Regions:
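Radical SAM enzyme [4Fe-4S]-AdoMet core and its adjacent flexible, acidic
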Residues: 1-134
Length: 134
């Protein structure tokens, strides 16, 4: 797993250099797609929400987000609308759900959680019903 404290320490160090510009670019995936407002609200430098995990059999793509969770995410984006999230709203509204792909993604996460000693639902509780069914 990434050592985020170390990574963010390096980000702050690079930001202190006069000849260095730091930007955040989130890779939008099935797990973080509902949390882009957090990036907008907490980015202390320019950011981009322009990278999307996408492709055939790409288990972490938005096709793995079930309708119930999409509705939760969309409700957040509608309630606290920002122009920067227009593409994300469109993805959540229009990309077709694939239950098989979601199951593969959650199995991959469950295997990783076992290896790392972590648990998906500690960070993303909205996935509980799906994660615990495996």
């Amino acid at each position: 797993p990434s050592k985020w404290e170390r990574i963010m320490g390096n980000v702050q160090r690079f930001k202190s250099f006069d000849n260095c510009e730091v930007n955040y670019h989130a890779t939008i995936n099935a797990l973080n797609v509902g949390y882009m407002l957090d990036i907008i609200d907490n980015a202390d430098c320019p950011f981009g929400l322009d990278n999307l995990v996408y492709g055939d059999n790409e288990i972490y793509s938005i096709v793995s987000v079930p309708p119930e969770i999409r509705e939760q995410y969309l409700a957040k984006y509608y309630l606290d609308y920002r122009k920067e999230t227009d593409a994300i709203i469109t993805y959540l509204e229009n990309i077709e759900y694939d239950e098989t792909q979601m199951t593969c993604m959650l199995q991959d996460i469950k295997d990783r959680d076992k290896y790392r000693g972590t648990c998906l639902i500690d960070l993303f509780p909205e996935w509980r019903n799906y994660y615990e069914k495996l």
